Amino acid sequence: MSKVTYIIKASNDVLNEKTATILITIAKKDFITAAEVREVHPDLGNAVVNSNIGVLIKKGLVEKSGDGLIITGEAQDIISNAATLYAQENAPELLKKRATRKAREITSDMEEDKDLMLKLLDKNGFVLKKVEIYRSNYLAILEKRTNGIRNFEINNNGNMRIFGYKMMEHHIQKFTDIGMSCKIAKNGNVYLDIKRSAENIEAVITVASEL
């Protein structure tokens, strides 16, 4: 069976061939744009691609982030289950190899930092759409993009991150002034990072609330 077939099977037939195909494309590249997805699938046609992206969003498997698209934790579970199904049927030795790999853990200090972040976000009037774990990172996703900010994150690599889109330069400057590093992608996505500590988390959220 093809990769698409295993994705469909792992989804318990929630997905069909087109939605599964597009989900795989989005999973391969974080923040891929709808235009880029259409370029990958000219055979499907723009209207079909757009429609199926909409279906994936409604099913909670894909989310918009600025102009980009990312898969959700639920979609990642489907993909992981599909890989397991493939291994069971075609290469059981892969399961042994995978069993030796340890997923990055959600550590106790991450939990503490996440709780502090959520407390401060609430205190400063930020309204959250949801909090989720994505690739062993805590994401506090705002209900509406605020001053370009989409997410506040507690990351497994020891950093706190702000993920934004087309943030104003003088707003970015306020964050870099407190020691955050900044990366700006060509598509307008902004990544602001700083080492996690209670002091830094409070400073970041204070600056964000004063923009």
Curated annotation (Swiss-Prot):
InterPro entries assigned: MotA_Tscrpt_reg_C (IPR015241), MotA_Tscrpt_reg_C_sf (IPR036474), Phage_T4_MotA_Tscrpt_reg_N (IPR015198), WH-like_DNA-bd_sf (IPR036388), WH_DNA-bd_sf (IPR036390)
DNA-binding region in chain numbering: 23-42
Any one Gene Ontology molecular-function term assigned to this protein's record: DNA binding
Keywords: Activator, DNA-binding, Transcription, Transcription regulation
Further facts: MotA synthesis starts immediately after infection and stops abruptly some 4-5 minutes later.
Role played: Required for the transcriptional activation of middle promoters. Middle promoters are characterized by the presence of the conserved sequence [AT]3TGCTTNA (MotA box). MotA binds directly to MotA boxes.
Name of the featured protein: Middle transcription regulatory protein motA
Gene that this polypeptide is encoded by: motA
